[in-house]
């Protein structure tokens, strides 16, 4: 089975919101990604709506259903509703995405930069996982590769984990990928042994994705946004998506 590509379109919304208009059109960009071979679309709506807004989530849900591809909504399940942000659970009730990825990011974070600490908030997290699964959504938890308690994600009711790959990308760029890859491979093995599916995301790029997939077993899906959109500035959006699809097709999911 080929690892699936879910394109995160947050950066398209960042560019649109910087001018306060409707361009670039997030839905049109997502449609182009799907046409180029993306297997799904990811969004991460935040309470401050600095990029993806609630109305984008509804529109992208309709688009992904029209094209029969996966819709993955990321977000902090503990963030309460405010203003025009109805809360992650309510957005998922309205759209019933195929996958919900829970991320413990705070309002002040520029981007997601750490996974869950399963020593905290486990009871509330388990209750929320149950609520999302009642919607028919697969639930994935954002985790650090070095977390010794990855198997607890299964105990809490999660279906998958998403490995936070920022540290790997940094190590790869500095020529020190081997140690990081060993850590991520071990994390994937521990997750698989616990019955969890494995996703990965954050700072994966055309330069480092192939090495990651060659070393880390069983990666079912990668979520890529910032690098893909950055590369699209030089290559074009269609070509950038196709380049990732080609990398994924050159490998396969190994147990």
From Swiss-Prot:
One Pfam family of this chain: PdxJ
Residues annotated for 1-deoxy-D-xylulose 5-phosphate binding in this entry: 46, 51, 111
Any GO BP: pyridoxine biosynthetic process
InterPro entries: Aldolase_TIM (IPR013785), PyrdxlP_synth_PdxJ (IPR004569), Pyridoxine-5'_phos_synth (IPR036130)
Active site feature: 44 (proton acceptor), 74 (proton acceptor), 202 (proton donor)
Residues the entry annotates as binding 3-amino-2-oxopropyl phosphate: 8, 19, 203, 225-226
Listed GO CC annotations: cytosol
Keywords noted in UniProt: Cytoplasm, Pyridoxine biosynthesis, Transferase
Subcellular location: Cytoplasm
Catalytic activity, as annotated: 3-amino-2-oxopropyl phosphate + 1-deoxy-D-xylulose 5-phosphate = pyridoxine 5'-phosphate + phosphate + 2 H2O + H(+)
Keyword Signal: no
Site, Transition state stabilizer: residue positions: 162
EC number in record: 2.6.99.2
Top-level taxon of origin: Bacteria
GO molecular function terms listed in the Swiss-Prot or TrEMBL record: pyridoxine 5'-phosphate synthase activity
Pathway info: Cofactor biosynthesis; pyridoxine 5'-phosphate biosynthesis; pyridoxine 5'-phosphate from D-erythrose 4-phosphate: step 5/5
Homology family: Belongs to the PNP synthase family.
Subunit structure: Homooctamer; tetramer of dimers.
Record function comment: Catalyzes the complicated ring closure reaction between the two acyclic compounds 1-deoxy-D-xylulose-5-phosphate (DXP) and 3-amino-2-oxopropyl phosphate (1-amino-acetone-3-phosphate or AAP) to form pyridoxine 5'-phosphate (PNP) and inorganic phosphate.
Name of the protein in its database record: Pyridoxine 5'-phosphate synthase
Organism encoding this protein: Xanthomonas axonopodis pv. citri (strain 306)
Gene name of the encoded protein: pdxJ
């Amino acid at each position: 089975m080929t690892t699936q590509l879910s394109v995160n379109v947050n950066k398209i919304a960042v560019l649109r919101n910087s001018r306060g208009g409707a361009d670039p059109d997030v839905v049109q960009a997502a449609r182009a990604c799907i046409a180029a071979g993306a297997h799904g679309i990811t969004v991460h709506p935040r309470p401050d709506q600095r990029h993806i807004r609630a109305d984008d989530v509804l529109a992208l849900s309709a688009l992904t259903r029209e094209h029969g591809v996966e819709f993955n909504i990321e977000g902090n399940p503990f963030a309460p509703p405010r203003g025009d942000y109805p809360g992650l659970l309510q957005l998922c009730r309205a759209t019933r995405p195929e996958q919900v990825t829970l991320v413990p990011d705070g309002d002040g974070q520029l981007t997601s930069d750490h996974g869950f600490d399963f020593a905290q908030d486990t009871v509330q997290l388990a209750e929320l996982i149950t609520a999302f699964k009642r919607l028919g959504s697969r639930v994935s938890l954002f985790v650090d590769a070095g977390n010794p308690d990855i198997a607890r994600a299964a105990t809490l009711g999660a279906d998958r984990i998403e490995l936070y790959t920022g540290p790997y990308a940094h190590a790869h760029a500095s020529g020190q990928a081997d140690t990081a890859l060993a850590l991520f491979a071990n994390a994937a093995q521990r997750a698989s042994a616990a019955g969890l599916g494995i996703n990965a995301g954050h700072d994966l790029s055309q330069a480092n994705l192939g090495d990651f997939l060659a070393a880390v077993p069983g990666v079912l899906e990668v979520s890529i946004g910032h690098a893909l959109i950055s590369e699209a500035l030089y290559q074009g959006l269609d070509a950038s998506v196709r380049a990732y699809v080609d990398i994924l097709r050159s490998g396969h999911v190994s147990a």
